[in-house]
Amino acid sequence: KAAVLAMVDLPTGAGMLVGTRTLASALKYLILMVIAGMLMYLGYVLADIYRPGELPGRIPLARFILALLTAGFALRLALIPFHAWLPDLVEDAAPMVSALIIAIINTTSLLVLVLSFQRFPVLLVENPLGPTLLRIGALVTCLIGGLAALQQENMRRTLAYLLIYNTGMVFYGLASISVTGLTGALFEAMNQVVLVVLLF
């Protein structure tokens, strides 16, 4: 991300080094990831301060914390409707950059999400509507990602929407709050890493 900021500060004529579309995609990615990081950080701070589940009257705060974490991770993982950065990034960036972001950073984010739900299980357990909404969001991501992939003419954008579809399937497994769902989600996440490395 620091490299993106360094490119912004390059002298006149730097446009010959980096294309305008590539720079725009990089800046979009940088800004959205900073916003995602702030949402997740705020969610973790509130979860650590208020310890949801320890006091009986704090369920609304647990819902707010879950909403913050969900929005942050949805932005980070390019779930619908926070997906706009991924097709642009895959289309405009170098293949190895796309592979690094999708295979390493997004998969690591999924593992952090699993650890977050393990550390604060009350966010899901004492909030019966939360997992249902997460599963609905994951299904919407799968549906829209798959349909959008069918409509693309650019192969790289098609791949990006298929990755969004796949991430929705992984997120559904995580939101199912079951050993089978979690195992399937982690297996599919590792499958996505192998697929991305082979494709790029």
Residue ranges and their predicted role:
Residues K1-F200:
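Alpha-helical transmembrane segments of multi-pass membrane proteins predominantly involved
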